[in-house]
Amino acid sequence: MKKIFLLFLSISVFSCTIDYKSKGYWAENCTNDTLIMEMNECNTISDGSDWIYNSSDSTLSSFDDTISGNILGKKTVFYKFYYVEPFSKSGALFQDFDTCYLYVIRCKILNKYSIEEIIRKKMYDRRTLTKKDFHNHEYK
């Protein structure tokens, strides 16, 4: 009887299908340029303060979450999910939305102009996206 119970218990435990669903949505950089990508629900781009790692920020889980880049010739540490190198994927940019906006700035532009000037002159690309634009949580 004990063997039968263990058999049924092991079948019920090991036969469970675990469905891992992706959390978040990604964007793929299919260009030769390094890009800064931001996805949000607002129809205006942020001031850039979310992209840059501040050493006093305590939410960083490891230094692997950041990458160095340049803004106006100065070394700047970005969160990896905003800084997307050529032919690679961003980190999870956004989790749950019906409609969102994807903002993209080329790092070449970010290294020549201030964030304020980029925003004022609209030197970025903006796309309006819905969940239908993502295939397997990824936008290309």
Model-predicted regions and their roles:
Residues 4-14:
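Sec-dependent N-terminal signal peptides
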Residues 16-26, 36-140:
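Intrinsically disordered, low-complexity segments enriched in small/polar residues
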Residues 30-32:
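Short solvent-exposed strand-capping/beta-turn motif centered on an Asx-Ser/Thr pair
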